[in-house]
Amino acid sequence: MEEFQRYIELDRSWQHNFFYPLIFQEYIYGFAYDHGLNKSILLENAGDKKYSLLIVKRLINRMYQQTHLIISANHSNQNDFFGHKHKKNLYYQIISEGFAVIVEIPFSLLLISSLEAKEKKIVKSHNLRSIHSIFPFFEDKFLHLNYVLEILIPYPIHLEILVQTLRYWVKDASSLHLLRFFLYEYRNWNSLITPQKSISIFSNQRLFLFLYNFYVCEYESIFVFLCNQSSHLRSTSFGALLERNYFYGKLEYLVKVKTNTKDFCVILWLFKDPFLHYVRYRGKSILASKGTSLLMHKWKYYLFNFWQCHFSLWSPPRRIYINRLSKHSLDFMGFFSSVRLNSSVVRSQMVENSFLIDNPIKKFDTIVRIIPLVGSLAKAKFCNVLGHPISKSVWTDLLDSDIIDRFGRICRNLSHYYSGSSRKKSLYRIKYILRLSCARTLARKHKSTVRAFLKRLGSEFLEEFFTEEEKVLSLILPRDSSISRGLYRGPFWYLDIICIHDLANDE
């Protein structure tokens, strides 16, 4: 965003969310396509103001004519690899990627101003950026709650509804018409939630991810507003980009549809709950409450009606589950999380009489989802579907040090991410698969046996699979000491992780 603030000089006619003229500035496409494409197709001497109307006009004409463009000799082989279908849509991709950059500008500027206004009120903490900060929150709050609502955010939303919602932010009709053209040209809305393992340079993921995030923001804006109004503890950390007139209009319409009354307090009374917590990561969200099952069914009914009335989106019942925390495990971010009771027996002696006191203690437990993780390892060709390690044949052409470094890096990343697991047995199995797969890969390369290869390398081979923390602990504390066992076996959350590690991305 800082790059845009240096380059973009908007005059007064552009400052009220009129961003259509930016489409004709060449550096927008340079920012959007700084990887993969040759920028020479967008470079032309367009004067001091860098307007390039002729270039964009040519791109639009070629897009309608469905002709083919050879970018340069350096990229010709790459284009042939993607084939005729991707060449056909190259011009659309160039303009859509530039438009994705442009449409993010008003939201980025409002977000920056919102954060600057809150700097004095909210203490900054880089640890809150970590996705692992969710689990300490679970450990602190979920022990006192009863029910949880597991929500899979429905999709796809109707494209026209999305454009109508976006027009309250982007008031330039020309830009909205162009957006509508992009959406109806590419109807791959279903691919938003499912991550793609390999995204080509001809995909418009940036535009669709922006639209999906905008859709989720619209859904959460009203949802969090109701939570704040119905809770005794108001949220101060939620920052949403809201257009207030439109926002309260939506609320009044929702009340009218649901209760046939103008009294807004009625709908707030239905969801009165002093202990309500909401967490979301990607397309899955969790709503936990200390209330009763009846209250959770009210929230479920509200969400169904909200999606249907506001987004014209019907959500199947199986996308929302109501579960009791004491009897159900949460499947969230690669962990099975649950609240279990640990019995603590205390012997009490009073004069001549003695008796036992059983004190049940609640504990938040997290377990690694071993079956999906083994499936990911099998898909990446580290083992078979049963979890038996196999050699990584595509890496046999690499140097021994590179092979060991790749396996060690994946093992350390997994250990880093799943270090918060309460039970390490599953994590040890994953480490075993990677170590033996590495040994078999090296043995296959040198046409030797695994036993002979491990005997030649010795303990130095295993050290590559240790994390830095494990290496330090092994030097400071003996492995069989009680303190060391507690550090190795207990959960430990790293607050520097901002995304889930992808096994397929081994580079």
From Swiss-Prot:
The keyword Cell wall biogenesis/degradation does not apply. Coiled coil: none annotated. GO terms for molecular function: RNA binding. Keywords: Chloroplast, mRNA processing, Plastid, RNA-binding, tRNA processing. Pfam families: Intron_maturas2, MatK_N. One of its GO terms (cellular component) is chloroplast. InterPro entries: Domain_X, Maturase_MatK, Maturase_MatK_N. It is found in: Plastid, Chloroplast. GO terms for biological process: mRNA processing; RNA splicing; tRNA processing. The keyword tRNA processing applies. Disulfide bonds: none annotated. Belongs to the intron maturase 2 family. MatK subfamily. Usually encoded in the trnK tRNA gene intron. Probably assists in splicing its own and other chloroplast group II introns. This is Maturase K. It comes from Browningia hertlingiana.
